[in-house]
Design a protein with these regions (language model features):
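Metal-dependent amide/peptide-bond hydrolase catalytic core
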Residues: 3, 13-14, 23, 27, ...
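A structural signal for isolated positions on well-ordered beta-strands in alpha/beta enzyme cores
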Residues: 64, 123-125, 273
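Residue-level recognition of beta-strand->loop/alpha-helix junctions
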Residues: 43, 126, 276-278
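Acidic/His- and Gly-rich active-site-bordering loop/insert found
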Residues: 1-93, 111-117
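Acidic/histidine-rich catalytic neighborhood of metal-dependent amide-processing enzymes
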Residues: 98-170, 212
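Glycine/serine-rich anion-binding loops at beta->alpha junctions
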Residues: 89-103, 185
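Short glycine-aspartate micro-motif
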Residues: 62-64, 90, 151-155, 176
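Short glycine/serine- and small hydrophobic-enriched flexible loop segments
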Residues: 7, 106-114, 202-208
């Protein structure tokens, strides 16, 4: 088990390193094949491949075991911080998120195979671009299709230090506001410009006001920018908004609210577009999850 953990941690496999992620996928493929699985991949040109491994007849209700192979770390991190055990604690890039979880999954499958356990068919689903939000692949669609027909799913992503089990998770969405103003020299033509920065600054307060803690919905304007030089009225400005929400009612309200904010004009002569860059659905708490 430790040897497998070390093997996975000591490979550079950040989301941008497709070759590294795919190499980890091949490592995992070999281990799962030795545990009786048939392995195949969804191949993506610009993202780590999606690994699918099956044991038993998965046309019948099966158990889905889910996770990812990539990390957030840049190339070279594995050499700088290799797999290390000190005072009973493992360190190294991705040792927690989620090479440890993948190692537990692989070890469990090996042990169950050796014990002859075959009560249910099993399907392993391991993404290669989770940390990048699957933005350059069709992995979300492909994983949902592969998970269809499962009795239940277990995600091997790391939980919290108290070893609790996560049975619900907020959804995430990202939006970008782009404001078009009118550029002008602030010395020669101080009244001629329409500052995109002024417009977007007014909108930031409106965006933040959409937060509803009781509903479980929060918004954060985490990135903002605009203009080029201090002596010119900013012709363009932008901001990027992170949204966390518990249910579809929350994200539906936020979408409508952000569109209304974009359409509202504080400074005549400016125009704003809002674009939804990313959306990941929430995992609601279900009675069936509590029973499981």
């Amino acid at each position: 088990m430790l040897a497998t953990w070390k093997l996975l941690v000591d490979r550079d496999c950040g989301s941008k390193n497709k070759a590294g992620v795919d190499a980890v996928g091949q490592d995992v493929k070999g281990i799962l094949e030795s545990a009786g699985f048939k392995v195949r991949f969804y191949e993506y040109p610009e993202a780590g491949n999606l690994l699918i491994a099956e044991r038993g007849d998965t046309t019948k209700p099966f158990v889905a075991l889910i996770g990812h192979l990539d990390t957030v770390f840049a190339d070279g991190e594995a050499a700088k911080r290799p797999f290390t055990i000190k005072d009973g604690v493992v360190t190294g890039p991705g040792c927690l998120d989620m090479k440890g979880g993948v190692t537990v999954l692989l070890s469990a499958m090996r042990i169950l195979n050796e014990a002859g356990w075959d009560r249910y068919p099993v399907k392993v689903i391991l993404a290669g671009d989770e940390e990048a939000g699957h933005q350059k692949s069709t992995a979300v669609r492909d994983m949902m299709a592969e998970a269809k027909g499962a009795l239940f799913g277990l995600n091997f992503e790391t939980s919290f230090k108290d070893n609790s089990v996560v049975i619900e998770r907020k959804g995430v969405a990202t939006f970008r506001f782009d404001v078009q103003g009118i550029g002008a020299h602030v010395g020669n033509n101080p009244k001629g410009g329409r500052s995109a920065i002024t417009e977007i600054a007014a909108k930031v307060a409106d965006i933040n006001a959409l937060t509803d803690y009781d509903e479980g919905t929060t918004l954060n304007v985490g990135v903002i920018g605009g203009g080029t030089v201090p002596n010119a009225c900013a012709e363009k400005a932008f901001c990027v908004v992170d949204v966390r929400y518990k249910g579809e009612a929350g994200i539906t309200r936020v979408r409508a609210g952000l569109k209304a904010i974009a359409d509202k004009v504080y400074l005549d002569g400016t125009h704003t577009e809002v674009t939804e860059l990313f959306y990941f659905p929430a995992m609601p708490r279900l009675e069936s999850s509590l029973e499981l």
